[in-house]
UniProtKB/Swiss-Prot annotation:
Main enzyme class: transferase
Catalytic reactions of this protein: a 2-demethylmenaquinol + S-adenosyl-L-methionine = a menaquinol + S-adenosyl-L-homocysteine + H(+)
Descriptive protein name: Demethylmenaquinone methyltransferase
Taxonomic placement: Bacteria, Pseudomonadati, Chlamydiota, Chlamydiia, Chlamydiales
Free-text function comment from the UniProt entry: Methyltransferase required for the conversion of demethylmenaquinol (DMKH2) to menaquinol (MKH2).
Keywords, comma-separated and alphabetical: Menaquinone biosynthesis, Methyltransferase, S-adenosyl-L-methionine, Transferase
Length: 229
């Protein structure tokens, strides 16, 4: 797992990306991240309240309340600017906000039935510590859904194309639209350094969360896991 010891610098990076984050993600994913988000929300299932971790600009939480209009959400992110972006763009959304690292959340034990984490796992300095913290705040039989960008298997015909896309297209597009080539080189490296499924799933198990469902998207370029406490 990519281990970035200097959290303040990573936080500053995400703060700087907030104004252009959604636009660039749409371009880089060719709009597929919206489809993936909808698939993710469908697999999460219904709950009155969603704990959205590494919430960013709130796309998963917004998709969730569109599907389940009676629901509300708590958005957790360590980037103040990302959460401010959600508040400014969606002031009437039924959201509460917590500025916090996922590894140490100011939330009580055994509180939430359902949590989500989209595109955040690879950014965690200590995935096991973060997942143990999620385990702490989930109620018994509570669920965590994870959606993450992953690498196709080396035997997959898409593997080489995906590698070229990460190495050439992602940093160039990120630099053009945000002026921050480092941030999108970081994105490339974070995907490349994400452990294989077996290693990740061992971490899930150690945290006390158990896989009840798994789905590969677009030849393995993204993966959804549904975990249960």
């Amino acid at each position: 797992m990519t281990n970035f010891q200097d959290k303040p610098n990573i936080r500053i990076m995400f703060d700087s990306l907030a104004p252009t984050y959604d636009k660039i993600n749409k371009i880089l994913s060719l709009g597929l991240h919206l489809t993936w988000n909808h698939s993710f929300v469908s697999l999460l299932g219904r709950s009155d309240h969603l704990l959205d971790l590494c919430a960013g600009t709130g796309h998963v939480a917004l998709s969730y309340i569109q599907k389940y209009p009676q629901a509300s959400a708590t958005l957790v992110d360590f980037s103040t600017k990302m959460l401010e972006n959600v508040q400014e763009c969606h002031p009437l959304a039924p959201f509460s906000y917590v500025i916090s690292d996922v590894t140490s959340m100011p939330l009580p034990n055994d509180t939430f039935h359902l949590a989500s984490m989209a595109y955040g796992l690879r950014n965690l300095s200590s995935p096991l510590e973060a997942l143990k913290e999620v385990h702490r705040v989930l109620k018994p039989k509570g669920r965590l859904g994870i959606l993450e960008l992953t690498r196709p298997a080396t035997y997959n015909p898409v593997h080489l194309l995906h590698k070229l896309y990460l190495n050439l297209v992602v940093p160039s597009v990120g630099r053009f639209y945000s002026g921050n080539s480092y941030a999108y080189s970081y994105l490339k490296e974070s995907i490349r350094n994400l452990p294989c499924d077996t290693s990740l799933e061992r971490v899930f198990h150690k945290s006390g969360l158990h896989i009840i469902r798994k789905r590969k998207l677009l030849f393995g370029t993204a993966t959804i896991w549904i975990l249960e406490k």
